[in-house]
Amino acid sequence: MTTVREIIQSPLFARQKKKLHKQQIKDLDRAIKFIFSAPTLGDMKVGDLQGIRIYKFKSNSQQILLAYEVVESTLFLYAFGSHENFYRELKKYLGGV
């Protein structure tokens, strides 16, 4: 099991987080703490998003998807959002990275 020592958020993740309300930020931070303590918690994706994990959590009774990747001891937070167009936008963003 990998021990995470550092968290890096993508510019997209930072922009998305700025738009949230206080309660949504608390829910997101709680989800990040879960991932930090157990990096293999999310579902591993295949195909174009191979290596990316998706963790699902609730915020204001809406399901939110959080895309992340663990490389060695670093947790990379890529994006989060509702299921609508999430994978398409994530694939487009990661293709440009």
Predicted regions and their residues:
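Arg/Lys-rich, positively charged N-terminal/basic patches that mediate binding to nucleic acids
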Residues: 1-31
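Residue-level signal for pocket-adjacent positions within structured domains
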Residues: 2, 15, 39-44, 81
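Enriched for short, Lys/Arg-rich terminal
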Residues: 2-6, 59-65, 69-97
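Residues that form generic nucleotide/phosphate-binding pockets
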Residues: 16, 31-34, 89, 93
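A short, surface-exposed loop/turn module that caps and links secondary-structure elements
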Residues: 33-60
